[in-house]
């Protein structure tokens, strides 16, 4: 998936997360995480972001996260929404690829 514009999703309310994405200049994803629970869950947040980016085969992108204690499912949903808003086709390929499809 190619990111062509900046996009964001989420709020700064308690138990939510604001995710902003933009095309990256370098060869790797650039993850910038600010979280009220970073000491406890910083690595889990990073892994969730990387899993979603890998699942959708996103080209190098900058992801800025301002977390206020959001659950994993909220983080995933906010990132998926930001990806949809930033990509050129306007929709995500939901579900896993079906290898047996003809």
From Swiss-Prot:
Q: Which domain of life is it from?
A: Bacteria
Which Pfam families does this one have? ACP
UniProt KW keywords:
Cytoplasm, Phosphoprotein
List the disulfide bonds in this chain: none
Q: Name one GO cellular component term.
A: cytoplasm
Task: Tell me where in this chain the PTM O-(phosphoribosyl dephospho-coenzyme A)serine is found.
Answer: 14
Concerning InterPro entries, the annotation shows: CitD, Mal_deCO2ase/Cit_lyase_ACP
Compartment(s) where it occurs, according to its Swiss-Prot or TrEMBL record: Cytoplasm
Function, in words: Covalent carrier of the coenzyme of citrate lyase.
Matching entries from NCBIfam families are given as: citD, PRK13253.1
Protein family according to the UniProt entry: Belongs to the CitD family.
Q: How does it assemble?
A: Oligomer with a subunit composition of (alpha,beta,gamma)6.
Q: What is this protein called?
A: Citrate lyase acyl carrier protein
Which species does the entry assign this protein to? Answer: Serratia proteamaculans (strain 568)
The organism that produces this protein has a lineage beginning with: Bacteria, Pseudomonadati, Pseudomonadota, Gammaproteobacteria, Enterobacterales
Source gene?
citD
């Amino acid at each position: 998936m190619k990111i062509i514009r900046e996009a964001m999703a989420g709020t700064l309310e308690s138990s939510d997360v604001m995710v902003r994405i933009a095309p990256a200049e370098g060869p790797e994803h650039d993850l910038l995480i600010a979280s009220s629970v970073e000491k406890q869950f910083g690595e889990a947040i990073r892994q969730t972001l990387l899993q979603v980016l890998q699942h959708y085969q996103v080209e190098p992108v900058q992801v800025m996260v301002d977390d206020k204690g959001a659950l994993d499912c909220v983080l995933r949903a906010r990132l998926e929404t930001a990806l949809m808003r930033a990509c050129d086709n306007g929709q995500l390929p939901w579900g896993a690829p079906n290898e047996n499809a003809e």
